[in-house]
């Protein structure tokens, strides 16, 4: 494998994981904070809020997992080598 391609693949994998985690990280923090304030305002709606929160957190986390998959493909099954 060309050393330049290998170095670029490692850098791209690091960027893929790092950038894929930034957006969902902010989104999960914001969603969790809003859920806590919603439960504080309406304690009787805790079940619905928690269920919706967990579903939305799973969808946000899937974006990070996609970034991890792309990084693993670049590192171990490099299509550019």
From Swiss-Prot:
The record marks 61 as: Reversibly protonated during proton transport. Keywords: ATP synthesis, CF(0), Hydrogen ion transport, Ion transport, Lipid-binding, Membrane, Thylakoid, Transmembrane, Transmembrane helix, Transport. One of its GO terms (cellular component) is proton-transporting ATP synthase complex. The chain crosses the membrane at residues 6-26, 57-77. It is a multi-pass membrane protein. It is found in: Cellular thylakoid membrane. SUPFAM superfamilies: F1F0 ATP synthase subunit C (SSF81333). CDD domains: ATP-synt_Fo_c_ATPH. GO terms for molecular function: lipid binding; proton-transporting ATP synthase activity, rotational mechanism. The keyword Membrane applies. Its main location: membrane. It holds the Pfam family ATP-synt_C. F(1)F(0) ATP synthase produces ATP from ADP in the presence of a proton or sodium gradient. F-type ATPases consist of two structural domains, F(1) containing the extramembraneous catalytic core and F(0) containing the membrane proton channel, linked together by a central stalk and a peripheral stalk. During catalysis, ATP synthesis in the catalytic domain of F(1) is coupled via a rotary mechanism of the central stalk subunits to proton translocation. Key component of the F(0) channel; it plays a direct role in translocation across the membrane. A homomeric c-ring of between 10-14 subunits forms the central stalk rotor element with the F(1) delta and epsilon subunits. Belongs to the ATPase C chain family. F-type ATPases have 2 components, F(1) - the catalytic core - and F(0) - the membrane proton channel. F(1) has five subunits: alpha(3), beta(3), gamma(1), delta(1), epsilon(1). F(0) has four main subunits: a(1), b(1), b'(1) and c(10-14). The alpha and beta chains form an alternating ring which encloses part of the gamma chain. F(1) is attached to F(0) by a central stalk formed by the gamma and epsilon chains, while a peripheral stalk is formed by the delta, b and b' chains. NCBIfam families: ATP_synt_c (TIGR01260), PRK07354.1 (NF005608). This is ATP synthase subunit c. It comes from Rippkaea orientalis (strain PCC 8801 / RF-1) (Cyanothece sp. (strain PCC 8801)). The gene is atpE.
């Amino acid at each position: 494998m060309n050393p330049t391609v290998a170095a670029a693949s490692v850098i791209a994998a690091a960027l893929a994981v790092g950038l894929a985690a930034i957006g969902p990280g902010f989104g999960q923090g914001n969603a969790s904070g809003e859920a806590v304030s919603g439960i504080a305002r309406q304690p009787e709606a805790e079940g619905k809020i928690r269920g919706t929160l967990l579903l939305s957190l799973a969808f946000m986390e899937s974006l990070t997992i996609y970034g991890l998959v792309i990084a693993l493909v670049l590192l171990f099954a490099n299509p550019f080598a």
